[in-house]
Amino acid sequence: MKDNGYRISVEMVRKLMRDMGLISIRQDAKDLYDKEQRRYKNYLNQQFTTTRPNEVWVSDITYFRFNNKNFHICVILDLFSRMVIAYKVGKVNSTQLVRSTFQMAYMERKPVLPLTFHTDRGSNYQSKTYRLLLRSFGVTQSFSRAHIPYDNSVMESFFSNLKREELYRTKYRSEGDFRTAVDRYIVFYNEQRPHAKNGYKTPMKKELDYLNKQAIL
């Protein structure tokens, strides 16, 4: 309006808006922050210790490139034992990849609620279909804070070990070789590799000890 030669004050704008029944929808920074905190609540807050299996699951996706192709690896760990309870390898980083991995974990573990599922803010985990899936199972969704990888450091550590101990050490001849190597490493990780957080027990041994103790009680 100023460019067209009109002069108008803030008060005049307010009066015109009142007369027309209009209201401002501007949100201040605190409102936006509070809304984000409610939408992406972090229930873990870097507390990575639990008292039983199926209390908290953590998940993430990484990718590995060979033969000019990206392969995406989605993994879910049980925070109690650090056991890999489900994983899938896909050629596309998609919501379907994370959905099918979660469904595999749920069918295998048949967890007793409450269960918290923690991830970063990747778009697949934020998607409406994925959030509805978790809600349909009664699972509480927890998110890392934006750009804070330490909020999901258990998964960061797992993928670092996977790449350092297996993927970066081998030149795969085919997709089949690569997938077999991932399968083999997961078995090794769960059944043979001691974990410091488990008192140097393997993830499987940590869970078996828990189950045996519960059977005695």
Question: What is the predicted function of each stretch?
Answer:
Residues 1-53, 148, 202-212:
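Basic, flexible linker segments flanking DNA-binding modules
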Residues 3-6, 48-50, 66-67, 121, ...:
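Conserved, non-catalytic sequence blocks in retroelement Pol enzymes and Pol-derived host proteins
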Residues 13, 17, 44, 60, ...:
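Mobile genetic element proteins and their domesticated derivatives, centered on retroelements
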Residues 26-29, 117-121, 135-154, 171-174:
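RNase H-like polynucleotidyl transferase catalytic core
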Residues 50-85, 91-92:
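An active-site-proximal beta-strand-loop segment
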Residues 88-111, 126:
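Active-site beta-loop-alpha junctions of metal-dependent nucleic acid enzymes
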Residues 111-126, 149, 199-204:
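Acidic/histidine-rich, metal-coordinating catalytic segments
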Residues 128, 135-139, 161-217:
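C-terminal domain-tail junction helix/linker
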